[in-house]
Design a protein with these regions (language model features):
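Catalytic beta-strand/loop cores that center a nucleophilic Ser/Cys/Thr
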Residues: 2-76
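Extracellular ligand-binding/catalytic regions of CAZymes and related secreted enzymes
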Residues: 59-65, 72-123
Length: 123
């Protein structure tokens, strides 16, 4: 439901939605907000069938926008979507963890939780 974005000059922050904190995609992702790069997309409202995992806000803008969510189609197909993805976002450990976990979730696999797997992906 993209209908615009805020200026890339505004600092943007993202955080896990507390009601989604136990979702498998957020396994190992910190709950503190972190700075993201690029511009914050305006996508509200999202479909009622989605599960919003993270929201973001641009400095000086009160409206929070979904930045990561999931949906499961009528046939059971899993979808993960994020509006994050500026090249600098890939330097953020929590973003990489979320992205990795989303791939495992969509493939109906459990993300490895051991330290070696974590380090190879996300540190």
């Amino acid at each position: 439901n993209y209908h615009g974005h805020h200026s890339a000059k505004l600092t943007t922050f993202a955080r896990v939605e507390s009601k989604a904190a136990k979702h498998p995609i957020l396994q190992g992702v910190g709950t503190r907000q972190f700075q993201t790069f690029g511009s914050l997309y305006e996508v509200s409202p999202v479909a009622k069938s989605t599960t919003v995992l993270m929201t973001g806000n641009a400095r000086g803008v009160n409206q929070r926008e979904p930045v990561a969510w999931t949906n499961v189609g009528p046939g059971g197909g899993k979808v993960f979507y994020t509006t994050l993805g500026h090249p600098y976002d890939f330097g953020i450990t929590d973003f990489r963890k979320m992205f990795r976990n989303a791939i495992y979730w969509a493939a109906d696999q459990k993300a490895p939780g051991d330290k070696k797997a974590e380090e190879s992906c996300c540190n």
